[in-house]
Amino acid sequence: MVLISGGLGYLGGRIAKYLLDSRFQVRIGSSQSHPDVPSDLLSCEIVICDLSDKRSLENACKNVSSIIHLASLNAQECDHDPEAALLINGLGTLNLLNAAKKMGVTKFVYFSTAHVYGSPLQGIIDENSTPRPMHDYAITHRLAEDYVLQANSDKDITGSILRLTNSVGSPLNSKENCWMLVVNDLCKQTALNHSMELHSDELVQRDFIPISTVCSTVVDVLTTDVLDGEIANVSSGTVLTL
């Protein structure tokens, strides 16, 4: 059984469907008691996964072999409430790790962000580059990374960290809060208005990676030991401007 925290979100929903299609048993953790579940995920077990509630986390981790931890505040939410960002992204990850260890989970895959390297990202970056998080979103993800690395070092659980760049693709749920992302915004404008207007700096360089590639990477991490105890940048390796 694989538990996906945040499994009804933009990326989590796509990963959940991909795992289902790959014949994994999937349990989705949600902070909501009655979430809106896309039709593609109706066969999944849905459980409460409140990152501040240790009992709900232990219940979510029962009979689970691996966890994909995606639940977090986004960049805008972190900027608006840095204290909540620390409690959810940072300490919430620690709470889930502790529940996972207590319930015998063997593998913990944490989705972090390439923004831990700095903002804006500059130069050639690899996994040996020194992290320099510059805003609350990156700072709290970096903190969570350290908790995962600590648990892995203590041999309490096998932890892996995936530092994601800009994943692009359609959501399972059209109501998902993902339409402010630049590629999604342009696609939505085209569909609704038959025109596009760029609302961000056209000179900013970005690395885009298809969500389908992210999903296949997750399967590789779950089914092999190639990234056990490791940090990996999940990116295309190609920088583009708009």
Q: In which residue ranges do the predicted regions lie?
A:
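Glycine-rich NAD(P)-binding loop of the Rossmann-fold in SDR/ketoreductase-type enzymes
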Residues: 52, 84-95, 131, 135, ...
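Glycine/proline-rich active-site loop of Rossmann-fold NAD(P)-dependent oxidoreductases
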Residues: 142, 155-157, 167-184, 194, ...
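Active-site Tyr-X1-5-Lys
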Residues: 119, 134-160, 165, 191-192
